[in-house]
Amino acid sequence: MSKTYIGIDIAKNTFDACFIAHNTWQNCTFTNNQQGFMELTLWIQAHHYNTSTLHLIIEATGTYWEKLAHWAISHHHKVSIVNPLYIHAYAKSLGIRTKTDKQDAILLARYGAKENPPLWQPKSDNEIKLTALLKQREHHKRQLIKERTRQEALSIYVKSYTDDNIRHWSDSITQLDHQIWQLINCTPELNHRASLLATIPGIGKKTLPHLLVAIGDGSSFQSAKHLASYAGLAPRHHQSGISIHKQSSIGFSGQKELRSALFMPAVIVSFGRYPAFQKFVKRMEQKGKTKKQIIIAIMRKLLTISYAVIRQNRPFDKRIHE
């Protein structure tokens, strides 16, 4: 039985849906709320499609997609959440320059039919809670940095007035760290994954929770390369003939917090502190890579190894991951 792919381009208040089946397509716009979800159901039923053949391809726009995705799962629909960068690249490969909500929905459906992306599984309640705690910690960390920077610019006569704010944000970060690790230690699946990640040289207590949130059980990513792309760590090459040969870069897309969490471990690894990665660092140096390129390559390597140990359910092995 062939699948029917429904592409969904979502915004804060509305979403456009388009299905492609038997070389024909139909599209419609709905409100991004429970009423709109029910109207989507009626629209699907009006076209006599079996729930078991439906596959919803939803673009990951902010957090606007989450309610619809959870609703779809509760109604036994297959769901894939797709990185907008993939759709942009797919449109570029087809030579499509027009960008409208309806056009994006059509593209998502076509992308689903061509790539059959992995199915999305909702996070457990504790994974959702861990994500929320980490976001709150990041907010408090930004506020702490802001206050410290502000204090440096203040006159010596008024610096003491910011001390209370700095103390407040520092204490709240300490409390959040305690809650984060209490949650990890008390949740069997999180604790197990954490124990696997902890075997990777360079991965410490500050980085580990970010990896748990980003990777989950690993099923949301087709490969380690897809995870690296999601994190914004996939290399971009710019080379043509013999005249154009620019330095590779990673751009500025993807998960900024995850990259930030991986940065310091990568810096430490780059100085040869961990024997397990010394050969890798030397190979990069012999290729003439800059220090920045080496650090980015190590960040990517730490991330892909993290994915591997979780997917394979095996601790770090120097012989495999060297």
Swiss-Prot record:
<dbReference type="GO" id="GO:0000150">
    <property type="term" value="F:DNA strand exchange activity"/>
</dbReference>
<keyword id="KW-0233">DNA recombination</keyword>
<protein>
    <recommendedName>
        <fullName>Pilin gene-inverting protein</fullName>
    </recommendedName>
</protein>
<dbReference type="GO" id="GO:0006313">
    <property type="term" value="P:DNA transposition"/>
</dbReference>
<dbReference type="InterPro" id="IPR047650">
    <property type="entry name" value="Transpos_IS110"/>
</dbReference>
<dbReference type="InterPro" id="IPR003346">
    <property type="entry name" value="Transposase_20"/>
</dbReference>
<dbReference type="Pfam" id="PF02371">
    <property type="entry name" value="Transposase_20"/>
</dbReference>
<dbReference type="Pfam" id="PF01548">
    <property type="entry name" value="DEDD_Tnp_IS110"/>
</dbReference>
<keyword id="KW-0238">DNA-binding</keyword>
<dbReference type="GO" id="GO:0003677">
    <property type="term" value="F:DNA binding"/>
</dbReference>
<dbReference type="InterPro" id="IPR002525">
    <property type="entry name" value="Transp_IS110-like_N"/>
</dbReference>
<keyword id="KW-0230">DNA invertase</keyword>
<dbReference type="GO" id="GO:0004803">
    <property type="term" value="F:transposase activity"/>
</dbReference>
<comment type="function">
    <text>May be the site-specific invertase required for pilin gene inversion. Moraxella can express either a Q or I pilin; the inversion of 2 kb of DNA determines which pilin is expressed.</text>
</comment>
<keyword id="KW-1029">Fimbrium biogenesis</keyword>
